[in-house]
Every structure is written in C-alpha cells, then in structure tokens.
Design a protein with these regions (language model features):
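N-terminal targeting leaders characterized by basic, low-complexity, disordered sequences
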Residues: 1-4
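Short, membrane-interfacial amphipathic segments enriched in basic
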Residues: 8-20
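Aromatic- and glycine-rich beta-strand/loop motifs that create alpha-glucan
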Residues: 20-29
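Hydrophobic membrane-insertion alpha-helices, especially the h-region
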Residues: 29-51
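Early extracytoplasmic/lumenal segment of secretory-pathway proteins
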Residues: 54-133
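Extracytoplasmic "Venus flytrap"/periplasmic binding protein-like
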Residues: 106, 111-196
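A bilobed periplasmic-binding-protein/Venus flytrap-type ligand-binding module shared by bacterial periplasmic
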Residues: 220-235
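Short amphipathic alpha-helical coupling segments at ligand-binding clamshell hinges
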Residues: 234-245
Length: 249
C-alpha cells in the first residue's frame, strides 16, 4: 500500500479514537518537533526578557547532572564577572545546572537537554558545556565542541595541554555521514586521554576533576569531570577567562 494511503487510513481511524490514543499518536510522531518549537520560543523569550531588563548576557554555561540552587548559580555568575573584571551592572553571566545529559538517550531528560544545546548553539547563546565525562562525550560526538586550539591562547594551550581530552574526528565524520543517510552509526566512545589510539585526535575538552570550582558545582565528585567550549560561542574572550577561572586556586 502506498505511504500516503496508509497515512490517510491512520488519520481516518484517529477521528473516532479516544483522547489517549490521539495523544499517544501525536507524541510518537511530533514530540521532537514540539521540543524544537518550545526551545526556540524559550530562546526568544530569554532574549526579550533580558532586553526588557536592559541586561546583556555576556557568558552562558551549562553544567549537567547536578542539582544546585538558583542562588548558587547566580552567585557563581557574579563571581566570574568579578574575576573577569566586568563591572557593567547591565551585563550578566548565567550558569545553568538544570539539565540532565547521558549517553543513554532513553533516560529521562536527555532529549530536552540535547534540544536545548542544539537551539542555544544555533542562536549563539551557549559558551561552555561541563559535567561528567559521559555527558561531555555526547557533546563531543554530536559536534558541539570547538577544537581548543582554535580558542585558547598559545600560553593557555601550554598550561592546560596536560589536561586536554580528545575526540576522534574520524568517528564524528562517520556519525554525521550516517545521520545524513538516516542511518544509525554505532560506536564505542574512545578513551579521551589516549589520542595515540585515535585516527584523527582533536583536543575538545579539558579535565577539570581537581578544580575547586568544579568541586563546588559537584560536591560529591566520583568520576572524571570535563568542560568544553561550545561551537556556538561568540564570547571567546570570556570563555578563555572562564577556563582560567575554573583553575583558580
């Protein structure tokens, strides 16, 4: 049976279906479209809100899988502004710890986090992504992280190179090619500390497990922690300063 005929039959059957059946149909077919529209609206709303308050967001970081209060997030944003020497009261730094991200795409909240990252990256509102290595692996191999050599100064590269974490660009390319063909590319995340075992190693994240600032964000660190620079950033100077800020004693 032609696809269009099947679609027409489904639509006809839905006319007399219960609300629950109709809702399940809608959710199965349109949930990602719905998430996309919602996050675009959220991005627009945030822009309108900050504009109406006369404020400008000069830095935005997302840290995954932690549950901190808004007060903590605001204080950390203010502390970073002070560190960066930004004294304009109309400029704000936002730290967002409200999202969960895991390599297991079936876990609750993962879809929302990925949609938020996608939307805020495409609208140049996202600067830094941080969290457990499992979360950052997702960002690495979804193509959301910059090659650190493109952003960090030569001096910073010398200082932080011992903490660099690498992704394999060859795997990312194969994954993206498969996506273009609507195919699923299955792979195992390579060890990011062993670029010598990769086909095309690229430094895209920094191990921040021992940074005191990360220990405040994650009071009970039991795994490797990392941060990477969003490919959507237009605040490169502030991003460089934030990396230094995280490593401050």
């Amino acid at each position: 049976m032609p696809v269009m005929d099947e679609f027409k039959e489904e639509r006809a059957a839905l006319k007399n279906a219960s609300f629950k059946v109709k809702w399940n149909y809608f959710w199965d077919y349109y949930k990602w479209h719905t998430f996309g529209v919602l996050f675009v609206l959220i991005a627009i709303s945030m822009f309108i809100y900050t504009s109406s308050k006369g404020t400008e967001t000069v830095f935005y970081a997302m840290f995954f899988n932690t549950d901190l209060t808004e007060t903590f997030n605001e204080e950390m944003g203010k502390e970073f502004l002070a560190y960066a020497g930004i004294e304009d009261k109309k400029q704000v730094a936002l730290v967002d710890t409200s999202y969960y991200l895991s390599s297991d795409s079936t876990e609750s909240g993962v879809g929302s986090a990925l949609q938020k990252i996608s939307t805020f990256t495409s609208t140049n509102q996202l600067d830094v992504l941080g969290g457990p290595l499992d979360s950052i692996n997702v960002c690495m191999y979804d193509g959301y992280l910059y090659d650190l050599r493109m952003i960090l100064t030569e001096e910073q590269q010398e200082v932080y190179e011992p903490y660099f974490l690498y992704s394999d660009a060859a795997i990312l390319e194969k994954k993206q090619e498969a996506a273009k063909n609507s195919e699923i590319f299955e792979f195992t995340y390579p060890d990011p500390t062993k670029p010598e075992n990769m086909e095309e190693p690229v430094p895209v994240a920094i191990d921040v497990s021992n940074c005191k600032k990360m220990q405040l964000i994650y009071p009970e660190i039991t795994e490797q922690m990392a941060v990477g620079i969003s490919t959507g950033t237009i605040q490169q100077e502030n991003v460089r300063l934030f990396v230094d800020y995280l490593f401050e004693e």
